[in-house]
Amino acid sequence: MNLQGNKIKSEGAQYLAESLRDCTGLQYLNMRGNKIKTNGAMMVTELLFTHDKLLSLNLGDNKIDHDGVIGILSVLNSSNYTLEELNIDNPVYKTIC
């Protein structure tokens, strides 16, 4: 599913994550270049708990802060996932470093 550059904010990402919970065949989710902040990114990342076929998740070029990156990695560390590709490249995060 390609949702790149649709100006989706965190609230929209949360609704999307809730809507996709039953879509267990989802393999690719591209949400690059939206306006998603940490809370929305965490909701999307938690899809990995129920989507064992998700292979690629792109959350790059959003507004995910340092805590969000740590949270995403924590979810990945605690789930039994098959994710092969994760993009969390973030210009906001780069300015913090």
Annotate each language-model stretch with its function.
Residues 1-97:
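Leucine-rich tandem repeat or coiled-coil scaffolds
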